[in-house]
Regions:
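Structural motif
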Residues: 94-96, 127-129, 156-158, 220-221, ...
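Short, structured patches in soluble enzyme cores that scaffold and shape functional sites
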Residues: 89-91, 99-101, 122-124, 132-134, ...
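A structural signal for small-residue-enriched, beta-sheet-centric alpha/beta enzyme cores
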Residues: 163-288
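Internal, conserved structured core segments that host functional sites
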Residues: 111-173
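A short, structural micro-pattern
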Residues: 28, 50, 114, 141, ...
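A short, polar/proline- and glycine-enriched secondary-structure boundary/capping micro-motif
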Residues: 54-58, 106-111, 140-142, 168-172, ...
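N-terminal, charged/glycine-rich beta-strand/loop interface patches
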Residues: 2-134, 139, 275
């Protein structure tokens, strides 16, 4: 275990210990816990803990708040891997979270799932932007992913979760996958939004149904929870392609669902929407 300081913030880093010879092959594990604080008018890093295959990078500070870039040094996830991320946007701060690259869910062994667990809290008067790049599902993958966001009543939150079904450039189709995906948003301790998906088997056949995805190769969910959400509905609808829709599920919560033929088409359609909902800014990682 090592303790260092970064920009005045204490950082704890743990070294991974590999199993003894003859044990099962080591699986990738990673943990990142971070929190922000207010320093004058700026949002800055308060605490950071990182271990294993998870790392967190911090571009230069900006007037928009603190940006953090998550990195999986294992290059992807497969059966038996475990990644946990926790972040707290403290009162009055702005925190933007993204990933350095697309996450890849590789072919897994028959039994274990790859586990990804993300838990975010947004305190009073704070804003959190959860803007990971696409997760790409490979044929044979097994992924169990959970995202929980806890918000104070006057907090603001923007999230996007893009999902890509196979490697289109290689002609890959998802005929055998296992997927469990759950997104939960709590406001003042009460459930405000829940989206859950569970699938096992031939996903490609399911996606090809006209009433499901009509052969789409990628999809995304966007949620904007803010006192200004209602005023964003009409402008956002104007930006959407024919394969997307937006609605208010509460006066202060806007939900967008989007389908696209390819991951490139999905990102190209998402970018103007995210810019609109994020004060005309996006992390550099998102640039085409």
């Amino acid at each position: 275990m090592a303790r260092i300081r970064f920009r005045g913030c204490p950082i704890t880093q743990f070294a991974s210990i590999l199993p003894q010879q003859g044990a099962n092959p080591p699986r990738a594990k990673g943990v990142v816990n971070l929190s922000t604080k207010k320093l004058g008018e700026n949002s800055v890093l308060d605490t950071l803990l990182q271990s294993g295959s998870s790392k967190c990078l911090f571009p230069r500070a900006s007037a928009q708040g603190l940006d953090a870039v998550l990195l999986n040094t294992a290059g992807g996830v497969t059966g038996g891997d475990s990644f946990r991320f926790t972040a707290n946007a403290a009162e009055g701060t702005t925190l933007t979270l993204t990933t350095q690259a697309c996450e890849r869910a590789y072919k897994a062994q028959p039994r274990p799932y790859a586990q990804i667990s993300n838990h975010l809290t947004v305190s009073s008067g704070a804003r959190l932007n959860w803007l990971p790049q696409e997760t790409i599902l490979f044929n044979g993958s097994a992924l169990d992913r959970r995202l929980q966001i806890e918000m104070d009543p006057d907090a603001t939150m923007l999230l996007v979760e893009p999902l890509v079904f196979g490697r289109a450039a290689m002609g890959e189709t998802l005929t055998d996958i296992r997927l469990r995906d759950r997104i939960e948003i709590l406001r003042d301790g009460a459930p405000a939004f829940l989206d859950a998906m569970r699938f096992s088997g031939d996903l490609q056949a399911h996606l090809c149904r006209p009433h499901v995805a009509n052969g789409a190769g990628a999809m995304a969910l966007v949620v904007f929870a803010s006192a200004t959400a209602e005023g964003q509905l009409a402008p956002v609808r104007h930006l959407l392609p024919d394969t997307a829709g937006a609605s208010l599920i509460q006066n202060d919560m806007l939900v967008i669902r989007m389908l696209a033929k390819t991951s490139f088409a999905l990102r190209r359609a998402l970018m103007p929407v995210l810019r609109r909902l994020n004060n005309d800014t996006l992390p550099r990682c998102w640039m085409l």
